[in-house]
Every structure is written in C-alpha cells, then in structure tokens.
Design a protein with these regions (language model features):
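Short, conserved beta-strand element in jelly-roll/cupin
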Residues: 97-100, 114-133
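Residue-level preference for beta-strand/loop junctions
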Residues: 87, 104, 118-120, 158
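Catalytic core of Fe(II)/2-oxoglutarate
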Residues: 120, 131-170
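Acidic, glycine-rich loop-and-strand cores that form catalytic or ligand-binding grooves
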Residues: 82-89, 93-99, 128
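Non-heme Fe(II)/2-oxoglutarate
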Residues: 1-87
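Histidine-centered catalytic micro-motifs
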Residues: 105-113
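Conserved hydrophobic/aromatic beta-strand scaffold that supports enzyme active sites
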Residues: 7-9, 95-97, 125, 155-157
Length: 170
C-alpha cells in the first residue's frame, strides 16, 4: 500500500449527458433501498446518513459505466497498491440522493465491512449530480480537508479507513 495519496480523482470522468443517463437508469432499475442499520451510527445509535440510498447490482449497471472497473483497478495499482478483487456482478452499487429541501448530509464516518471473510480497502465515488450548493465532500486525516475537486462528473477513489463526510445540501 502506498502512503503517498489519501485520494485520487479524475475530473469530468462522466459528461452531464452520461451522468443523467446513469442516474435515471439507477432510479428506474434499482433493486433495493439501503436499510437504516447498514449505515454509520452515532453514539446514540442514530443514523449519521440523512440521504436516500438506492441499491443496484454491479451486473445490472456495469455496461452503462463504461471502463469504470478497469479505471479503478488501474488508478489503484498506480496510486494505492491494494490487491483488489474483480468486481462481483452481485455486489451492490449505491446511489446516494442528497436533497436540498431536507438538507441531506452524511456525518463523519469511515467505510468498513462487517464481514469476517472480506474487508474494504478503497472507496470509489462518482459524482453524478448536476450543479448544486452545499454538500461538500470532506476527509479527515489529521485535519479536515474539503475535496474541492469532487465536482459533478468526477471519479474519486480514497482509502476507506479515512474519515469522511458530506456537509448539508442547501
């Protein structure tokens, strides 16, 4: 594993037209909605996530995402050095829907697995939004850092153990 980067990004990975097509496909074909107990909780056992999350299997969405899997493996190999498994067709992809009317947000958390047989090394995010206000993506690795590069269309990879949050959408 490389310690050089906390995150890696590619701006304009998807165009506005592609983002709209992908979002609409997920909204119309999602297989489930994330359960409340699957998200990070605070010390009072309340959800830190105030957003709706649609789930879709990788096998159902991968053709719409072009070379995403190859890109992720390549960027990982050159910037992080994790040994990643190929994407599984039954693995769930998440679409977090942040609503400005509800001031949607996701408080400080890190990504992890509750499994005894696999773990999570790398988190991959694609910003499928159109322009918006608020909803800043931040990481904390010794100090808080707003990832200004995470704009609509950006592909972002980061080490899953790094604390991160999404500020309220306004």
């Amino acid at each position: 594993m490389s310690w050089q980067y906390d995150y890696w990004y590619v701006e304009n990975y998807y165009s506005a037209k592609e983002r709209k097509k992908i979002s609409e496909y997920i909204e119309n074909n999602h297989t489930d909605i994330e359960k409340p107990d699957a998200v990070a909780m605070d010390k009072n056992n309340a959800s830190k996530k105030k957003a709706n999350t649609l789930l879709i299997e990788w096998g159902k969405i991968k053709n719409m995402l072009g070379n995403l899997e190859s890109s992720v493996h390549s960027y990982n190999q050159h910037n992080f050095g994790y040994l990643l498994s190929p994407f599984n067709n039954l693995s769930k992809c998440l679409l977090n829907v942040y609503d400005s009317k509800k001031k949607s947000e996701y408080g400080w958390h890190y990504d992890a697995s509750r499994s005894d047989i696999y773990d999570v090394k790398l988190t991959v995010l694609v910003n499928l939004s159109d322009k918006y206000t608020g909803g800043k993506f931040c990481i904390f690795n010794g100090e808080e850092h707003v990832v200004e590069e995470f704009k609509p269309g950006t592909l972002l990879l980061f080490k899953s153990y790094i604390n991160h949050k999404v500020t309220p959408r306004s």
